[in-house]
């Protein structure tokens, strides 16, 4: 398996920017839970790990193993999140930008950021290059996607112990048939995004019939 390229990182390293940071998020499309972002700064002389890919292309076991290896390889890693309340208040796009900004703040100072996706005019970033499909083309962004995915999945697994009805240890908050069936049966928890589930809101009796596990 050929390792992902460092061509984007090298373009800035060659300009004298040593702290180039890859940024990615996970959880934008979920019905429950926060959106989480990771920022990863790699050493200029780093050798890409061959297995690193977009986190969606890896198994949970592969991600867990690479998570530890990336932490060992990186100069700095920052995690940022935006809560369900923030998502409902400002919308998922702006909440995602908040999560990314918080992740970047935890690896400051940094010289230039490579961010997965396409940024809108409301993005609160400077010194940034947005790369569509960045987690498939940039090694540092792919590393960030793995870190963010593992951190969020572990958080949702902990929440699943409190709300076992929703299968969050398996679906991590995405709208799978299992999750939607549980919503029909038990209603919303405090961890569900009301702005994503407006059709379930009219009946107050339908709000959180699930009893948290002790």
UniProtKB/Swiss-Prot annotation:
It is found in: Cytoplasm. A divalent metal cation binds at residues 24-25, 116. Coiled coil: none annotated. It catalyses: Endonucleolytic cleavage to 5'-phosphomonoester. GO terms for molecular function: manganese ion binding; RNA binding; RNA-DNA hybrid ribonuclease activity. The keyword Manganese applies. GO terms for biological process: DNA replication, removal of RNA primer; mismatch repair. Its main location: cytoplasm. The keyword Nuclease applies. Pfam families: RNase_HII. InterPro entries: RNase_HII, RNase_HII/HIII, RNase_HII/HIII_dom, RNaseH-like_sf, RNaseH_sf. Its cofactor is Mn(2+); Mg(2+). Manganese or magnesium. Binds 1 divalent metal ion per monomer in the absence of substrate. May bind a second metal ion after substrate binding. Endonuclease that specifically degrades the RNA of RNA-DNA hybrids. Belongs to the RNase HII family. This is Ribonuclease HII. It comes from Thermosynechococcus vestitus (strain NIES-2133 / IAM M-273 / BP-1).
